């Protein structure tokens, strides 16, 4: 693997840095306090091409490789994880699933809107009673002539309040476990689908997170993505790449924590000198720096494997596991450097810690990642 970036990748990274500086950084505190990112950011993300990364230009995408995608999601994560999540879900989980599994009609209907920011997508997998055990969904899709009628509910759905389309997973057959799960593309204006915004989150407060309720939601059979019974495969393939995106966002959080800690330590004075002169402060900062580099390299390795068409799912779990835990450590250490000021939301490190904490939970908890890695190493499933 070449650890250097191409001119194109360097340019994309700089484009993302400039975008964060111009469109995100000035608003982060206000969005966090209001629990509401300005939705106009979606269109801006589309205009700059970030919602079309790795998607063929034929369908409105901006092309590029997965390392470029990781560079962008890292920078967005450095700026505001609530905004990064918009891209990771609408592009990473929804648009990329349509590109991989959809037929021509589905690609042409949904991809141009998703890549431009005209549409927002959400990923309807998690349920009130089903998180890690994603193969045991209770949402049902029953065939009725040329349609399916869907009943159930989904919980903690990123982009759920804003979404124009849900990539929805429901049990459509009586086959056991995950074999009975199918995937559907459901427009959110379909009769019977209602949404409730979830407020009071610890972190990602600006993100539009929702609970979805489906009562006799009728969709045509043509809304099914991939063959019947392949929904779990759609979900797992999406999450394998999604974990790479989350890992990249976590690198961004950790990098932001490092930048903040260094800046504060070299300015704040105690005992007649800047606190950077104190050995234990340098220890905190050096620990963050090592975590940043290690997490970034693990993430880049996944992107390299994806771009070369090699198996990557286990490496993606490793990257997500390490990077998410590293982001929590980094933000916590940065807060320690700040002392009491770090506990006030006028300073960035408290939000970094709040945002980092959920990264160890969604798209597979740290414990689930360890089971995935352990299964790959031993050949024994502990699920």
Regions flagged by a language model, labelled:
Residues 95-101, 123:
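Flexible, glycine-rich active-site loops centered on histidine and acidic residues
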Residues 146-147, 151-195:
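A short core secondary-structure module
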Residues 64-65, 133-135, 159-163, 177-180, ...:
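Short glycine/proline-enriched turns and hinge-like loops at secondary-structure junctions
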Residues 136, 189-218:
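Flexible, small-/acidic-enriched active-site or ligand-binding loops
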Residues 117-125:
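A short, Trp-centered hydrophobic/proline-enriched beta-strand micro-motif
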Residues 87, 114, 129-132, 156-159, ...:
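Short Gly/Pro-enriched turn/cap motifs at secondary-structure boundaries
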Residues 1-83, 89, 101-106, 113-118, ...:
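Alpha-helical interface subdomain recognition
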Residues 122, 136-140, 147, 165-169, ...:
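Conserved hydrophobic/aromatic beta-strand scaffold that supports enzyme active sites
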């Amino acid at each position: 693997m070449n650890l250097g970036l191409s001119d194109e990748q360097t340019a994309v990274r700089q484009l993302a840095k400039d975008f964060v500086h111009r469109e995100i950084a000035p608003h982060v505190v206000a969005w966090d306090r209001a629990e509401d990112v300005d939705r106009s950011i979606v269109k801006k993300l589309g205009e700059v091409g970030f919602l079309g990364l790795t998607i063929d230009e034929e369908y409105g995408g901006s092309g590029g490789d997965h390392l470029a995608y990781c560079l962008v999601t890292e920078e967005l994560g450095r700026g505001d994880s609530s905004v990064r999540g918009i891209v990771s879900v609408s592009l990473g989980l929804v648009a990329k699933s349509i590109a991989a599994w959809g037929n021509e009609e589905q690609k042409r209907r949904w991809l141009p809107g998703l890549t431009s920011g005209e549409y927002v997508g959400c990923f309807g997998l998690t349920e009130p009673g089903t998180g890690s055990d994603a193969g045991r969904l209770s949402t049902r899709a029953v065939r009725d002539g040329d349609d399916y009628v869907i009943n159930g509910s989904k919980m903690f759905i990123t982009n759920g309040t804003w979404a124009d389309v849900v990539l929805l997973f429901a049990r459509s057959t009586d086959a056991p476990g995950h074999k009975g799960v199918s995937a559907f593309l459901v427009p959110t204006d379909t009769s019977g689908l209602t949404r409730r915004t979830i407020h009071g989150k610890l972190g990602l407060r600006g993100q539009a997170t929702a609970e979805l309720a489906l009562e006799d939601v009728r969709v045509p059979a043509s809304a099914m993505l991939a063959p019947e019974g392949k929904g779990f495969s759609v979900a797992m393939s999406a999450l394998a790449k999604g974990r790479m995106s989350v890992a990249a966002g976590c690198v961004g959080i950790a990098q932001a924590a490092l930048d903040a800690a260094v800046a504060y330590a070299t300015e704040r004075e105690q005992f007649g000198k800047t606190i950077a002169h104190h050995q234990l402060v340098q220890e905190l900062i050096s620990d963050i720096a090592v975590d940043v580099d290690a997490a970034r390299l693990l993430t880049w390795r996944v992107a390299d494997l994806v771009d070369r068409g090699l198996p990557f799912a286990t490496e993606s779990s490793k990257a997500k596991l390490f990077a998410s835990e590293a982001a929590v450590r980094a933000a916590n250490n940065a807060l320690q450097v700040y002392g009491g000021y770090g506990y006030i939301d006028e300073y960035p490190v408290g939000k970094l810690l709040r945002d980092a904490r959920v990264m160890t939970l969604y798209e597979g908890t740290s414990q689930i990642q360890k089971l995935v890695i352990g299964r790959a190493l031993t050949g024994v499933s502990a699920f």
